[in-house]
């Protein structure tokens, strides 16, 4: 693995400028610093997206018209515009209404550097409004995904295998075939692998799950 690899953070956005600023603040607060920011503006009419001050220290892809409204493109296809101009060794995804905890990238880069894996994701907290470190938020995997998916797996329930804070080392195809345990804003993936795959397919929904299956 490359020492101190560059991470391109791809953020699609449409008319959610104030949310986007919170997302960008969380990127700026990362303890891992070798980062480039790539924003894909999907035809927003909020003029704050187009100011010189906003453009500073970012790569911005401004799409003239909203691609979802015109062509029916899903969010995966919008991310592809950012992937195309990204120069990082890794691509990390962040939606404009999500934020990261400060050590998110550092932790994942460290884990990837000690393994043969080319992609990493994490659990995520579910909540609304500004993050409050003193508040208890439900987690997506333990509080939602594992409890919702009670179908049998290998003859036993998912909860049998995924006890609290004892997550699997990796996801297999059978798990992904049942439902999606991976939140896109938690993903970091090797850029070469993603480019070899051709990025996300143009699907109206579930393009992210389709992509994760292709990674396997």
Which residues fall in each region the model found?
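N-proximal low-complexity "stem/linker" segments adjacent to membrane-targeting elements
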Residues: 1-28
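Glycine-rich, basic loop-to-helix element that forms the pyrophosphate-binding segment
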Residues: 66-86, 107
């Amino acid at each position: 693995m490359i020492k101190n690899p560059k991470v391109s953070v791809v953020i699609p956005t449409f008319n959610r400028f104030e949310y986007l600023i919170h997302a960008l603040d969380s990127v700026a607060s990362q303890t891992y610093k070798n980062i480039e920011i790539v924003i894909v503006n999907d035809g927003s009419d909020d003029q704050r997206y187009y100011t010189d001050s906003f453009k500073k220290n970012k790569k911005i892809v401004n799409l003239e018209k909203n691609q979802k409204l015109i062509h029916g493109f899903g969010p995966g296809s919008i991310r592809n515009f950012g992937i195309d101009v990204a120069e990082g060794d890794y691509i990390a995804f962040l939606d404009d209404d999500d934020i990261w905890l400060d050590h998110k990238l550092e932790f994942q880069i460290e884990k990837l550097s000690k393994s043969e894996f080319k992609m990493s994701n994490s659990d995520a907290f579910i909540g609304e409004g500004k993050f409050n470190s003193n508040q208890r938020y439900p987690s997506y995997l333990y509080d939602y995904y594992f409890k919702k998916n009670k179908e049998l797996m290998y003859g036993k329930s998912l909860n049998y295998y995924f006890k609290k804070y004892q997550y699997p080392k990796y996801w297999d195809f059978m798990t992904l075939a049942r439902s999606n345990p991976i939140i896109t804003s938690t993903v970091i993936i090797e850029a070469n692998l993603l480019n070899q795959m051709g990025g996300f397919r143009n699907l109206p929904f579930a393009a992210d799950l389709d992509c994760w299956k292709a990674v396997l």
